[in-house]
Amino acid sequence: MSEAPKKRWYVVQAFSGFEGRVATSLREHIKLHNMEELFGEVMVPTEEVVEIRGGQRRKSERKFFPGYVLVQMVMNDASWHLVRSVPRVMGFIGGTSDRPAPISDKEVDAIMNRLQQVGDKPRPKTLFEPGEMVRVNDGPFADFNGVVEEVDYEKSRLKVSVSIFGRATPVELDFSQVEKA
């Protein structure tokens, strides 16, 4: 009795913006052709981010790898043709066009760890770092430039050193009140 070949992870390039649809179509094709034993997971790694638009907090999903779908599969002619036959799939990444290379276990572990770290707390869409130049776009300090001193992601606030009358003055602002300079 021979052991079943091991499923490896492959990166499939899809039309940008259609990653979710490609993943869904691929799952449907797998079921339709009774090839479940050759395939494992099909996923589009995402994280939840928070952005502030018009003073409103909005949650949205950001893809880790825009334009790519990760597929766990046993590579053979039948599975290769099935993936290639899915609409909006451009091909595999790595290796040659007819013999794709799987991504390493180390890379898979790094992706899985990143997905687990995302957890429940959505991240802000725009990330600020101390020392970064920002422009205040709202409030009494609108149109002033400043340097980020501290970032509080829990409260979505920044401490910015704004130059007022030639003196650096620390000002606490909301993420929505500043933009990158």
Swiss-Prot record:
InterPro entries: KOW, NGN, NGN-like_dom, NGN_dom_sf, NusG-like, Rib_uL2_dom2, Transcrpt_antiterm_NusG, Transcrpt_antiterm_NusG_bac_CS. Pfam families: KOW (PF00467), NusG (PF02357). Coiled coil: none annotated. It comes from the Bacteria. Residues 130-161 form the KOW domain. The keyword rRNA processing does not apply. SUPFAM superfamilies: N-utilization substance G protein NusG, N-terminal domain, Translation proteins SH3-like domain. GO terms for biological process: DNA-templated transcription termination; regulation of DNA-templated transcription elongation; transcription antitermination; transcription elongation-coupled chromatin remodeling. Belongs to the NusG family. Participates in transcription elongation, termination and antitermination. In the absence of Rho, increases the rate of transcription elongation by the RNA polymerase (RNAP), probably by partially suppressing pausing. In the presence of Rho, modulates most Rho-dependent termination events by interacting with the RNAP to render the complex more susceptible to the termination activity of Rho. May be required to overcome a kinetic limitation of Rho to function at certain terminators. Also involved in ribosomal RNA transcriptional antitermination. Monomer. Interacts with the transcription termination factor Rho and with RNA polymerase. This is Transcription termination/antitermination protein NusG. The gene is nusG.
